[in-house]
Amino acid sequence: MLQSPAQRYQADLDSGAIVPDEAQRITVDALQDLYLRLEDRAQVKPGLLDRFLNRSRSAPEQGLYLWGGVGRGKTYLMDAFFEALSFDKKKRMHFNRFMQRVHEELTELSGMKNPLDAVADRIASETIVLCFDEFYVSDIGDAMLLGGLMQALFDRGITLVATSNIPP
């Protein structure tokens, strides 16, 4: 049976697998809240008119950016959140791998008008929740590309959860 992020965290505390940490508790509370909102939305099925008018995607639930030092439990907490989600349209990947995929798709779509929209459409067809481990952008070109892509994903109702060692 699936455990919510809060249940998983508490079970791991009770078993001694992890030690209590106030920052983790605060993060678990935020992940639990997001988890509950996403699960509620997953239960609502769009009607025929909504599908006809392409209104099946509403505004995304605001995601989370988990940052802190190495070894603080960010990836563990994000994974607990990801594993708890009961629906299949979710994706978890290392951020570097995601950027490789984006660059590959942009190369494939070169010459197309608005290729970022096509990439966003592909991603949105696969997932409604996108979890990135080790989110980090150092290249100005990637930063500019990500600005447009993230907006396109949010416009398509995608919720983002990311871990990083770098403050926002």
State where each predicted segment sits.
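Hydrophobic positions on the alpha1 helix immediately C-terminal to the Walker A/P-loop
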Residues: L77, F81, H94
